[in-house]
């Protein structure tokens, strides 16, 4: 692995992502496991920290950007992986917040997202990393996850509002935000209706398993449509031409039917587009140290409808309010925030409530 790192470093590569890197330390003695899938034996093994230090030193990548994808990890281990003086990784991906809609922890069982659980996870990881010098990689989407706007928002009625709210929710947090291809356009799940449209081997296998569990064809396809890794693996939607401008040939998988409306060309010069909103988020993070380096405090932990937190650094304070629901909710303001300046929002005007999927960022 060190040879691979040196090879790409010599070509000018500035950073590396390590896939499920916390499973590289395996036990020397194999034990029987009568619970679960055995992951407790191979996840965050006792030599992972040692191996990472050796890899960073041998690969000559200390000081470069490195992000580790962590499987079933813990906060304590990720603090150790990312603490600056440990010379292991710059930041970690963890997936706990993306399991809040798993019924009984099972990916292929549907349920509504548990937003209180999600908020608690955000708070635990944000405050834990802050207290002990660790660093989070912030994300909703990747190549294995459904599209966030279809999963935690509305990809129809409130498509734009929910896509922008989800973006703001993590881009103002402490850590490094990641934007998955097409997320900045609000790309949705493709909503395939036939199993033949899928290429993902996991989805095809679970189609058979679910049918064997006596689920109907319609029930099975609904589950697959909401959970498949193919939801995020359809071609990038560049424009409204055939195949969304991705290729003049035949793509390996189909394209979402909404590509003529949701594509890069349609948003390139549109000042009120989702892409424009993302550009504003990136610009604010570059401009305002409180976003990239300030502290974070979470508010209203028992409110299942509202994600709210404060960022502060001694000079500037921000209040981030995100309505997680497809309905109007109350807009609570802490003492001293009534006359604060509106820095950003995904509605053109202001209101005394938070409208469906509304986000508001206040500054003082």
Annotated model-derived regions:
Residues 1-336, 341-364:
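Active-site and adjacent substrate-binding regions of carbohydrate-active enzymes
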């Amino acid at each position: 692995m060190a040879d691979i790192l040196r090879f790409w470093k010599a070509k000018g590569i500035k950073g590396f992502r390590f896939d499920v890197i916390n499973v590289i330390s395996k036990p020397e003695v194999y034990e029987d496991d009568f619970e679960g899938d055995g992951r407790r034996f191979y996840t965050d093994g006792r030599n992972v920290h040692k191996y990472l230090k050796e890899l960073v030193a041998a690969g000559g990548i200390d000081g470069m950007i490195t992000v580790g994808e962590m499987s079933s990890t813990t906060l304590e281990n990720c603090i150790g992986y990312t603490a600056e003086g440990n010379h292991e990784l710059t930041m970690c991906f963890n997936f706990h917040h993306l399991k809040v809609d798993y019924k009984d922890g099972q990916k292929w069982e549907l349920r509504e997202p548990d937003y209180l659980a999600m908020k608690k996870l955000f708070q635990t990881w944000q405050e834990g990393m802050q207290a002990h010098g660790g660093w989070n990689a912030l994300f909703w989407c990747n190549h294995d996850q459904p599209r966030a706007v279809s999963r935690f928002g509305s990809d129809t009625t409130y498509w734009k509002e929910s896509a922008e709210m989800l973006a703001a929710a993590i881009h103002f947090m402490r850590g490094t935000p990641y934007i998955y291809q097409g997320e900045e356009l609000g790309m949705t799940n493709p909503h395939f209706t036939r199993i033949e449209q899928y290429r993902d081997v996991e989805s095809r296998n679970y189609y058979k398993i679910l049918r064997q569990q006596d689920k109907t064809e319609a029930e099975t396809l609904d589950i697959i449509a909401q959970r498949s890794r193919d939801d995020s693996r359809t071609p990038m939607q560049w424009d409204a031409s055939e195949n969304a401008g991705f290729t003049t040939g035949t793509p390996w998988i189909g394209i979402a039917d909404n590509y003529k409306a949701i594509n890069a060309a349609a948003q390139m010069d549109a000042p009120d587009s989702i892409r424009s909103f993302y550009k504003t988020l990136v610009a604010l993070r570059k401009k305002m140290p409180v976003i990239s380096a300030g502290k974070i405090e979470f508010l209203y932990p028992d409110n299942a409808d509202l994600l709210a937190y404060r960022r502060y650094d001694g000079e500037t304070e921000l209040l981030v309010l995100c309505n997680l629901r497809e309905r109007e909710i109350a807009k609570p303001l802490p003492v001293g925030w009534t006359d604060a300046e509106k820095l950003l929002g995904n509605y053109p005007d202001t209101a005394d409530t938070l409208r469906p999927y509304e986000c508001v960022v206040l500054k003082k």
